[in-house]
Amino acid sequence: MTAASQAERTVLEEEFNWLLKEEVHAVLKQLQDILKEASRRLSMPSPGLEGQLKQENFILGSSTMDQVKGVLTLQGEALTQADINIKVAKSSQVMHFAFRDDKQWKLQQIQDARNHVNQALQLLSSRDDSYHFKTGAEVNKLMDAIMLQLTRARNRLTTPASMTLPELAASGLMKMFTPPMPGDVMVNFYINLSKLCLTVYQLHVLQPNTTKNFKPAGSSVLHNPGAMFEHNNTKFEVSHVHKVECVVPWLNDTLVFFTISLQLCQQLKDKISVFSSFWNYRPF
């Protein structure tokens, strides 16, 4: 090895040690600050402190139809109030439903996303300023674990859960309303990216003599007209589907925080891989 290459190697090792000692912790601090903001936006009110988390009203609408209108009240992960008007397709009669006073509906997607963010924060807090990273592999392992939690958190907000129509019919959501939902109407709430969505299904009962072509629909986020299912020994077909939605600004903020955090993790991994490429062997 020449003196020049030895000197270069010494400089690289010093830079790499500085990366492990200083820059890694600077990135971890950045990640912690960003994810604390994300967690705060996704947080639920503490018992007895519900007033600290503000209630927000959102008007549901669609640019193409007016069969369904609604106002939802969201407090963290909980839908605390819902006021829905549904125009019946056949008669143009308007049905009105609201949440019972003793009921609120937890949005599992927000709850799950918050849990993943908090797991990422726990990983970060396990490596405080006093911790000394000894190898690049150790940093990469931590970044991979954090990125896994953040990807799962993001996926919960971007990918609503699929449900079968019988699952929806048996859901506790159907028991939330006053007056009670009639047997030929079903609703579903879910998050899609930064939007809070309401889907309303209007159904008709299939007569026994018309069920020879009965083909139950599978699991889906959004079922189409014509989808069939059986519930409580009665066969139904979806006759009309109405979807309305509204943008929730803090969900959009949260998704941006996830993107920035994932980029920070990847950039740190990239820096470590650049150092490793300077050596003929893997020094970390």
Curated annotation (Swiss-Prot):
Protein name stated in the entry: Protein rogdi homolog
Cell location: Nucleus envelope; Presynapse; Cell projection, Axon; Perikaryon
Gene expressing this chain: rogdi
Keyword NADP in annotation: no
Main location: nucleus
Organism: Danio rerio
InterPro entries to which the protein is assigned, alphabetical: RAVE2/Rogdi
Assigned keywords, A-Z: Cell projection, Cytoplasmic vesicle, Nucleus, Synapse
Family: Belongs to the rogdi family.
CC terms in the record's Gene Ontology section: axon; dendrite; nuclear envelope; perikaryon; RAVE complex; synaptic vesicle
